[in-house]
Design a protein with these regions (language model features):
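Catalytic cores of the polymerase beta-like nucleotidyltransferase superfamily
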Residues: 1-277
Length: 277
């Protein structure tokens, strides 16, 4: 059998970031993987994934596969195990996540993810509309990676994100919240939040905030609209989640109510409670 380290960990190494974890893809079936290692946990046999426990941690090992039709805007209804690494990489979301490495065979990069890393580009693998229709959370993931890596999103990929963003209606609050939190905790949260507004995606994330864009404050101490001021505050506060959430919401009542202080606190409380922050 052959195996490759794959995905975000390879991307991070090539960029110069220490990976948080490592994923492995292999030609071995889940049953064969379990027979090869002493301690394994069948964490996702339906999709070909087995957790292999070693002396230095656990690693998700997944059989090469092709995905069938997606259900619930998240998972394929069925998968087909294959013996071709390229077919496995073809199903992945963006090119910089579709790079594999084997110590003997080196880098496998059929979709030029390394080139996109060099040019700092976020680009969907294959048909971008299909990629985002399969799992609309990939739209937020593209924004998050663009924010955290300071990469630009390729034009066709960006157009597909806008065309398919209605699929975010079917994504759970928990998954959306995780991506938003990662954007807020990045080195440039204002970039990510601005992108969510500019593309119209924020109406699926925190629709209550949409009125901040374009709302002028008519105050000599504020030369920006509410959104512009909020983004400036986000840029200057520490990378602490409660602090950055407070910065995001601190003027959210201005564009909706006259009694700003009261309604700002009520809006923030209701949004945070509903979203389980």
């Amino acid at each position: 059998h052959e195996g490759y380290v794959v995905g975000g960990c390879i991307r991070d190494v090539l960029i110069g970031i220490a990976p948080k974890d490592y994923d492995v893809t292999t030609s071995a079936t889940p049953e064969e993987v379990m027979s090869l290692f002493k301690k394994t946990v069948p964490t996702g046999l339906k999709h070909g994934t087995v957790a292999v426990h070693t002396h230095d941690g656990a690693y998700d090992v997944t059989t090469y596969r092709m995905d069938g039709e997606y259900e619930a805007h998240r998972y394929p209804k069925n998968v087909i195990f294959v013996d071709d690494l390229v077919e496995d990489l073809r199903r992945r979301d963006i090119t910089i996540n579709a790079i594999a490495y084997n110590p003997e065979k080196g880098i496998r990069d059929p979709f030029n993810g390394t080139g996109d890393i060099r040019h700092k580009i976020i680009r969907a693998v294959g048909n971008p509309i299909l990629r985002f229709k399969e799992d609309a959370l990939r739209i937020l993931r593209a924004v998050r990676l663009s924010t955290t890596l300071n990469f630009n999103i390729e034009e066709n990929t960006l157009k597909a994100m806008v065309e398919t963003m209605d699929g975010l209606r079917f994504i759970s609050e928990e998954r959306i919240r995780e991506e938003l939190n990662n954007i807020l905790l990045s080195k440039n949260p204002a970039r990510g939040i601005r992108m969510l507004f500019d593309l119209g995606i924020m109406k699926y994330v925190l629709p209550e905030l949409m009125t901040m864009s374009g709302f002028l404050q008519h105050n000599p101490h504020h030369d920006k609209d509410v959104l512009g001021h909020t983004l400036e505050v986000l840029t200057h506060v520490p990378a602490d989640l409660p602090v950055r959430l407070a910065a995001l919401f601190h003027d959210s009542g201005k564009s909706l109510f006259v009694d700003e202080a009261y309604f700002r606190s009520r809006i923030s409380e209701s949004i945070l409670t509903a979203s389980a922050w």
